[in-house]
Amino acid sequence: MKHMTLSEIADACCGIYCGDPAFLDCEVSSVAIDSRKVVKDTLFVAIKGARVDGHSFIPQVMEAGALCSLSEQDLGDVDYPYIRVSSCTEALKDLAEHYRRSLDIKVVGITGSVGKTSTKEMIASVLSEKYNVLKTEGNFNNEIGLPLTVFNIREEHEVAVLEMGISHFGDMKPLAKIARPDVCVITNIGYAHLENLGTRDGILKEKGSMTDYMNPKGSVIFNGDDDKLKSYTSRDGRTPVYFGLTSSCPFHVENIERKGLKGTYAEFVTPTSRFHAHISIPGDHMIYNALAGVAVGYALGMDNDEIARGIEKLVPIAGRNNLIEAKHYTIIDDCYNANPASMKSSLDVLAYADTRKVAILGDMGELGADELAMHREVGAYAAFKNTDVLVCIGALSKDMAEAAKETVLATEKNMKVFHFDTKEDFYQNMGQILKENDTILVKASHFMEFPEIVKKLSEEA
């Protein structure tokens, strides 16, 4: 990171410096909340979590080489410097906002109900063909993760692609205030976090507030096939630019050739040109991701050849449409998270398989009052997509299985349906359900811990 002095840090987070004044002009080399990631001259931020209080690690990290710590507690007569703050979490955000303002860099902010991470990966892949890019790693997209990502920006970076996730009203504005995006991308307005945000209109309002702190001359890029985003009215004179499968969107595709699990070929149309590219990861949702990449690349001055190369170089990441050729099965690992829309997209991908199609699906969280109906909807959709075997795991997924069975009876489909309360129950019956060369989709909300299933299938002797 670009170095900051302790004096600058104390001012930025409205803290009180405690210690030898000789250290005030010393510069920190990094910021960490994890004691295991402390290196020489790190600033350690003592976050108090649900299970662990970072304050208990302050002596340890100072001995390990940290330059200073942010603390909510009076540490007394210690022989190392610290900065006293009222809230370490708020101080972390304030410091990240200050650091972002010191950087001469373009920022692309990405949010949405579905596809934030895969869209982030696509946009970063595209932009990397022209720029030195930093992107959000993993799921570091909240009030803790976003600041830590911002601190990883170095002076040589030209563009930062930052994922911004929310679950409650009021979550977005602090993130946007830190990121100060030049380009705002919203992938869609779906049903994730309905439990907290009430309605899709509530989700739109909260996610749309990302534009409140953006560059006044920046670009707003939305999915034009999403009914809620299409209804979004411009703010402060910024009218969204739309991408989508429909030709009315300035950025769209024509001549789509779907090649099953080998991906998609398409002709991409921009306001001024058109070009062809191959998307290696299957599914129409990946076409949307690529279109977002095209629109962002276009906004940041890239040419068609650069954008096409970036699209074609994208590789999947674990837990998100990652195709694994295991010894006995082909596994579609999409188990990082789930909601009704992403479940359907994944079942669409499974439908491309040439072998027997098996879906192992689990509970979806934070869907609010309609959660049972939404699980039933997914079960019926699995039958509609001609899935051969549906395995439902979890309490909520019992309704998914019941709806699937009802659909099979009503439509005379040939899908076999199983329900298990736990993963362990499924493991005991796995040998009777799965067959050699099956193509298996694995997907559920994060709390279901389905990577364990992927690991078990991958390592089966």
For each feature predicted by the language model, list its residue ranges.
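Short beta-strands and strand-loop turn motifs
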Residues: 72, 107-108, 185-191, 223, ...
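Short gly/ser/thr-rich secondary-structure transition/capping motifs
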Residues: 22-31, 90-93, 141-144, 164-169, ...
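Short, polar loop motifs at secondary-structure junctions
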Residues: 69-76, 224-228, 245, 394-398, ...
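A short helix->loop->beta-strand "cap" motif at the edges of active sites that frequently abuts
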Residues: 64-67, 80, 214-219, 236-239, ...
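N-terminal leader/targeting and accessory segments in enzymes
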Residues: 1-94, 98, 352-355, 380-381, ...
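ATP-dependent carboxylate-amine ligase
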Residues: 1-17, 43, 182, 196, ...
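Acidic-glycine-rich active-site phosphate/pyrophosphate-binding loop
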Residues: 119-123, 257-275, 320-323
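Phosphate-binding loop of NTP-binding sites
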Residues: 8-11, 91-224, 228-238, 432, ...
